Design a protein with these regions (language model features):
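Hydrophobic/aromatic-rich core segments of domains that either
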Residues: 178-185, 190, 195-270
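Alpha-helical repeat scaffolds
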Residues: 290-297, 324-337, 364-377, 404-413, ...
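Alpha-helical junction/boundary sensor with strong preference for TPR arrays
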Residues: 302, 333-340, 377-381, 415, ...
C-alpha cells in the first residue's frame, strides 16, 4: 500500500513539508485502505495535497473515524477540475461540525468512504450545497431517510414567475437575487421546474448526511437517494435513460448499480484491492506474467469492480496479449458480470475487448462472439438499459444486408419469448427494417410460427405481437415500447365516438394519460384484448377487461408527473355497474398510494372532478371489491409538473 501511496502522491512524497502527514497516513492501515479502496483515485497529487491540508489544520481527524472518512471522500472528489479546494474545505467543515453537534441523519455515521464521495461531490448545482444552502435545507427539511424521494416537492413547479418571466430565461430568478439567504430558499418561494426541483431533493438529502445525486433524463431532470443501506431509489424520475451527474466510474445507472453491488462485498473489495496493487507493482518491475496472474486473482475475488476491469483490459492491450488471452478474458468477464450486469459487460466488451480482436475476425467469428454474449442475457439484469445501441453496433459488424438479416432473424427466435427483451426487440426491428420487405416477411413468419395460427398475414402478426408485448412493456414500465407497439396496433380498431359527440366535457389542462401505459390484473384473460390497451388512455379509445376475482384493479402510468384536474372513465352500456364503488388512488412512485375518490353509482360515464385537491401523481390505480372491471376509455387530465 505504501508504494501505491507514493505513486499517487507524486513529487510531494519526498517533500519534507509533508513528512508528518505521510507518517500519520502510513501508520494507519484503515485510513490507507479508505483512500485506496473507495473507488477511482484520480489526479493523485491534488487529492493528496488537499488531504494533507485538512490534516495539517486538524491532526486529530486521523483518530476520528467518521471525520477521517469524510475528509478522505472530499479529497477524492477533487479529482475533477470543477470543484476547488476552498469549496471542498467548506464541505468538510459542514459535515464535521454538524456531525459533532448530532444534527445529521443517524445513517451518516455508518457510511463508508465511497458513499461519502456523493456527499462531497454534491448535486448538479453547486450553489445548492454551499454552507448557507446546506444549513437552510437541514433546518427546513429534516425527515426520515426514506422520505427524501419526495423532498423535491418542497418547491412549487412553476414555468413562469409572478412577473410572467419564463423559467427558460435568465429573468426568472433575476428580480429575487439577494432577497433570500440561498438559492434553495429562493426556489421554494419563487418556484422552478425539473432542474430546480431535482437539485432541491438531492441537496436536502445531502444536507442531512444522506447520499444522493442528480441525473439528466430526456427532456427532464431527476435525482436518486440512497434510501436504505445499499438501496438507491430514483426520485422524480420519468425514464430509465439516465445520465448521472455524480458517479464513481461511468455516468450510467447500470454502472452505479454495479458499484453498489461491488461495495456490498466489503471484504472482497479490500482483498481484491491488495491483489490489484500487487499487479501494478509487478508490472512496474517488468514482471508482466506475474502482474497478469495478480490481476486475474483480483478479478476472481471481486469480479464486480468496473475500475479493475478497465485497468486489466488496458493492461492486455498495452502488452499486446494474444487471441487466446482475450478469449479467456471474455469468459472471465462474462462469468463475473452476466446475467446481472449486462450493460457494464457490454461496454467493457465493446470499448476494450472487441476493439482489439474484431479487426481480423471473420463475419462468422464476430457473430459467434456476439451470440456468446447475447446467450447469457436473462432479462435486464440490474435495470433497463440501451440494449438497442448494442444491437445496432453488432448489426453493423456482421456483414452485408443478407447476413445482417440472418443475424437479426436468429436473434428474434431467441428473444421473442423473453418478457423483458422481447418487446423492445420487436420494436427495434420494426423501426430498423421498416422499409425492408424481405426482412419484415421473415420476421412475420417467425411471429406466426410462435402463435401457431395462420390467416390474415400482417394484421394477424401485429395483433398477436401486441397481445403479448403490450402487457409485458407495461409491466416493465417501458413506455417507449408500449407506445410504439400500441400505436401500430391501433389501426386494427375503429376509434370510438369523440367526447364531444358523446356530450362529455373534458377537464382543463392536457390529456396527461396520453403517451402513458396501462397495466391490469391478469392481462390476456378470456375476456381481455391486450392489443387494444393502448387506446384506452387516448381519446380514440380501446378496451380492456380485468380478470374476475376478489379485488380487480388496473393502473395508469403517466409519461410525466402531473397535477390532476380530473379523470373521465367510459364504461360499457348495459354493464355500467362494473364501475360502481371503485376506489381511485394516486401515487408518485407506484408504491405508496393515497385514495382520492370513489366512483358513485352505476354509470356509463364517470367524470371524477379532482380540481379542489389537484393531487400530484404519476400513477393512478382503480380497484374495487369483487367481480371485474372494463373501461374503453380512462382519460386523465391536468397540468404537467415535470
Amino acid at each position: 500500500m505504501v508504494w501505491s501511496l507514493e505513486q499517487t502522491a507524486g513529487p510531494m512524497w519526498n517533500d519534507p513539508r509533508f513528512e508528518d502527514f505521510f507518517e500519520a497516513l502510513t501508520g494507519n492501515e484503515a485510513w490507507m485502505r479508505a483512500l485506496l479502496d473507495s473507488g477511482p483515485v484520480e489526479n493523485g497529487p491534488r487529492v493528496m495535497a488537499f488531504l494533507a491540508r485538512l490534516w495539517t489544520e486538524d491532526p486529530g481527524l486521523a483518530s476520528r473515524p467518521v471525520d477521517r472518512s469524510m475528509a478522505t471522500a472530499c479529497a477524492l472528489e477533487l479529482r475533477a477540475a470543477d470543484r476547488d479546494e476552498d469549496w471542498m474545505q467548506s464541505r468538510y467543515d459542514y459535515f464535521r461540525d454538524h456531525h459533532a453537534d448530532a444534527l445529521l441523519n443517524r445513517c451518516y455515521e455508518e457510511l463508508e468512504t465511497w458513499e461519502r464521495r456523493f456527499l462531497a461531490r454534491g448535486p448538479q448545482y453547486t450553489s445548492w450545497t454551499s454552507p448557507e444552502s446546506l444549513t437552510f435545507l437541514r433546518e427546513r427539511i429534516c425527515w426520515p431517510r426514506s422520505e427524501y424521494v419526495s423532498a423535491c416537492w418542497q418547491a412549487p413547479y412553476r414555468g413562469f414567475n409572478c412577473f410572467g418571466d419564463t423559467v427558460q430565461g435568465w429573468l426568472y430568478y433575476h428580480p429575487f437575487r439577494g432577497a433570500f439567504r440561498c438559492d434553495p430558499e429562493m426556489t421554494i418561494e419563487v418556484g422552478g421546474v425539473c432542474g430546480a426541483l431535482s437539485n432541491m431533493g438531492a441537496a436536502a438529502a445531502i444536507a442531512n448526511g444522506i447520499p444522493a445525486l442528480t441525473m439528466g433524463e430526456p427532456g427532464h431532470c431527476a435525482y436518486a437517494v440512497q434510501t436504505a443501506p445499499g438501496v438507491w431509489t430514483p426520485a422524480y424520475s420519468l425514464s430509465w435513460k439516465r445520465g448521472l451527474h455524480s458517479a464513481l466510474h461511468r455516468r450510467t445507472w447500470a454502472s452505479h448499480q454495479l458499484a453498489q453491488a461491488s461495495f456490498d462485498r466489503r471484504a472482497s473489495v479490500l482483498a481484491a484491492g491488495d491483489k490489484a496493487r500487487l499487479a501494478r507493482w509487478q508490472e512496474a518491475q517488468g514482471e508482466i506474467n506475474r502482474a497478469d496472474a495478480a490481476w486475474r486473482s483480483a478479478l476472481a475475488i471481486n469480479g464486480l469492480d468496473e475500475g479493475h476491469w478497465v485497468e486489466y483490459l488496458r493492461f492486455g492491450a498495452r502488452h499486446d496479449r494474444d487471441a487466446s488471452w482475450w478469449r479467456r478474458t471474455i469468459r472471465l468477464l462474462q462469468e463475473s458480470l452476466l446475467p446481472d450486469h449486462p450493460e457494464v459487460a457490454w461496454v467493457l466488451l465493446k470499448d476494450h475487448v472487441f476493439a482489439m480482436i474484431l479487426g481480423d475476425a471473420s463475419v462468422r467469428d464476430r457473430t459467434t462472439l456476439f451470440n456468446q454474449y447475447l446467450a447469457k442475457l436473462e432479462g435486464w439484469g440490474s435495470g433497463r438499459w440501451n440494449i438497442e445501441s448494442a444491437w445496432n453496433w453488432m448489426l453493423e459488424r456482421v456483414g452485408d444486408e443478407r447476413q445482417q438479416r440472418q443475424f437479426v432473424t436468429n436473434l428474434l427466435r431467441d428473444s421473442i419469448d423473453s418478457p423483458d427483451l422481447g418487446p423492445p426487440f420487436i420494436s427495434w426491428t420494426s423501426s430498423r427494417f421498416e422499409d425492408d420487405e424481405d426482412a419484415r416477411s421473415a420476421f412475420e413468419n417467425i411471429l406466426l410460427s410462435k402463435t401457431r395460427r395462420s390467416g390474415e398475414g400482417e394484421d394477424l402478426v401485429l395483433r398477436q405481437m401486441a397481445k403479448t408485448m403490450l402487457p409485458a412493456a407495461a409491466e416493465a414500465h417501458d413506455l417507449e415500447t408500449f407506445q410504439r407497439i400500441g400505436k401500430a396496433a391501433s389501426r386494427l380498431f375503429e376509434p370510438r365516438p369523440s367526447l364531444a359527440e358523446a356530450g362529455i366535457e373534458p377537464f382543463p389542462g392536457i390529456l396527461l394519460s396520453s403517451g402513458g401505459a396501462l397495466r391490469i390484473w391478469e392481462p390476456g384473460n378470456r375476456w381481455d384484448s391486450p392489443e387494444a390497451h393502448w387506446g384506452v388512455l387516448e381519446e380514440r379509445g380501446g378496451s380492456f377487461h380485468t380478470q374476475v376475482g376478489d379485488k380487480p384493479w388496473f393502473e395508469v402510468e403517466l409519461p410525466q408527473f402531473g397535477e390532476i384536474e380530473g379523470i373521465i372513465l367510459e364504461g360499457r352500456p348495459g354493464q355500467a355497474h362494473r364501475g360502481a364503488d371503485a376506489r381511485i388512488l394516486v401515487s408518485r412512485d407506484g408504491v405508496d398510494w393515497e385514495q382520492v375518490a370513489t366512483l358513485e353509482g352505476a354509470h356509463v360515464w364517470y367524470r371524477v372532478d379532482l380540481s379542489k385537491t389537484r393531487p400530484r401523481a404519476r400513477f393512478i390505480r382503480v380497484e374495487r371489491d369483487g367481480k371485474c372491471m372494463h373501461f374503453p376509455r380512462v382519460l386523465v387530465y391536468g397540468r404537467r409538473s415535470s
